[in-house]
Amino acid sequence: MAIYKYSNKVEAVWENADHCSCGSNDCHPNSHRECGICHETIFYGSHETVQNQRNSRGAWNLDHIKPISRGGSNQTKNLQAVHIFCNRSKGNRY
């Protein structure tokens, strides 16, 4: 598994995300999590900042649970790890 180092905020949000329920014997505990929106698998090494990963199946980024435009904050408690396409689909909804 490749080693990635993200910002402290990204790492904190990843750690707070629900663990995947894939049941795979080769599922490393820190390599998968569940998308906060659709609850499908996201992959640690597929964060949007990793080159060539933005369009991968498990690509993810940070979503503001309550959008900034609706009074939300950039605090970790208002952020969740989600698929990039789920984040785009959610848009400004809360």
What residue ranges belong to the model's regions?
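Cys/His/Pro-rich metal-binding microdomains
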Residues: G36, Q80, I84
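Cys/His-rich metal-chelating microdomains
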Residues: T41-Y44, F85-S89
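Basic side chains
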Residues: R33, R88-R93
